[in-house]
């Protein structure tokens, strides 16, 4: 996470109703600690406009001049209306769109910008791309996002079906993104966060970000460590105590400390269902193998929201 004064959150709009539900969670973060919010809709390249980026850009600018909404703008407008209802956007609503040039992308993007009451920036962003995952990751890098929120309304896939089922867009983004990603399912504030820890360097690297997020959210924190075998329970207990002490040293008293034995992904998924968010550290595996890691297995199995912390 960067040293910016405010947390920056990129919310992907268009992945189903879960993306809109996540806006309540973003508003909760903004109430607790002023955040910058970008709402992004990525539309696949129009089939009739694939001859080149310049043709796409000129055609889209002409459409805007004619007063016609581009595909995707309605989704962003719906998200904007939700933020207005939540009080995140107030005052006069600017309905104009501005075209921004992007290096390496001749089509650019269309942007509408606001300021919220605390001084944070809110932007609506419309991009066109042949590959949605690449565009989202690129936008997150340009925005210097700390967190990407992407909705996922697909049913969890387990067993042999995982080998033949196309990977969800949310998990593709989580595998390629350089910042933390929340795979959002029923993402509602108020039910606490479950932080999953181990006694290793990955957890130690995650803890400062988990503490920062806890301060930003103001949510109660529970800690969980899972030992695969009973003889490793003591290691799990040490991991939970190490994490608890780190939180206490940073002004947060964990709500509970949990130690369990079993398959980590199964235990985390089961216990995590009662929480608003499950937090797990990213795997060191390369992007093409992350689906076999505990973090991404949990994100694929869970019926609620999972944050993969990077």
Region spans (language model):
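N-terminal start-of-chain detector that recognizes signal peptides
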Residues: 9-12, 96-98, 119-121, 154-155, ...
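Gly/Ser-rich helix-loop-strand patches that form or flank binding pockets
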Residues: 5, 18-33, 128-188, 269-310
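Structural beta-alpha unit
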Residues: 1-4, 81-148, 248-296
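Small/aliphatic-rich secondary-structure junction motif
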Residues: 2-92, 176, 187-258, 301, ...
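Short Asp/Glu-rich motifs
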Residues: 49, 102, 159, 233, ...
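Short amphipathic alpha-helical surface micro-motifs
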Residues: 20-21, 103-109, 164, 175-178, ...
């Amino acid at each position: 996470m960067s040293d910016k004064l405010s947390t920056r959150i990129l919310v992907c709009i268009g992945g189903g109703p879960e993306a809109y539900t996540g806006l309540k969670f973003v508003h909760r973060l903004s109430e607790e600690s002023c955040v910058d919010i970008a709402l992004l809709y990525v539309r696949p390249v129009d089939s009739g406009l694939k001859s080149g980026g310049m043709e796409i850009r000129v055609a889209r600018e002409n459409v805007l001049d004619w007063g016609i909404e581009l595909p995707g703008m309605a989704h962003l407008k719906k998200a904007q209306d939700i933020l207005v209802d939540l009080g995140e956007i107030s005052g006069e609503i600017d309905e104009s769109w501005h075209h921004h040039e992007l290096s390496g992308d001749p089509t650019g993007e269309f942007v509408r910008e606001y300021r919220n009451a605390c001084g944070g920036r809110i932007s609506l962003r419309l991009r066109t791309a042949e590959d949605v995952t690449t565009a989202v990751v690129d936008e997150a890098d340009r925005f210097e996002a700390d967190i990407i929120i992407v909705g996922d309304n697909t049913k969890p896939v387990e067993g042999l079906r995982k080998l033949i089922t196309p990977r969800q867009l949310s998990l593709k983004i989580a595998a390629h993104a350089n910042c933390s990603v929340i795979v959002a399912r029923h993402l509602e504030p108020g039910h606490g966060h479950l932080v999953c820890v181990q006694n290793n360097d990955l957890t130690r690297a995650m803890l400062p970000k988990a503490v920062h997020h806890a301060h930003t959210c103001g949510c109660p924190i529970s800690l969980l460590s899972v030992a695969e075998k009973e003889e490793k329970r003591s290691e799990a207990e040490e991991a939970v105590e190490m994490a608890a002490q780190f939180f206490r040293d940073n002004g947060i008293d964990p709500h509970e400390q949990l130690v369990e034995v079993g398959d980590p992904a199964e235990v985390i998924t089961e216990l995590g269902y009662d929480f608003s968010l499950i937090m797990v550290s990213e795997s060191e595996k390369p992007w093409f193998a992350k689906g076999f890691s505990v973090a991404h297995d949990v994100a694929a199995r869970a019926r609620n929201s999972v944050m993969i912390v990077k």
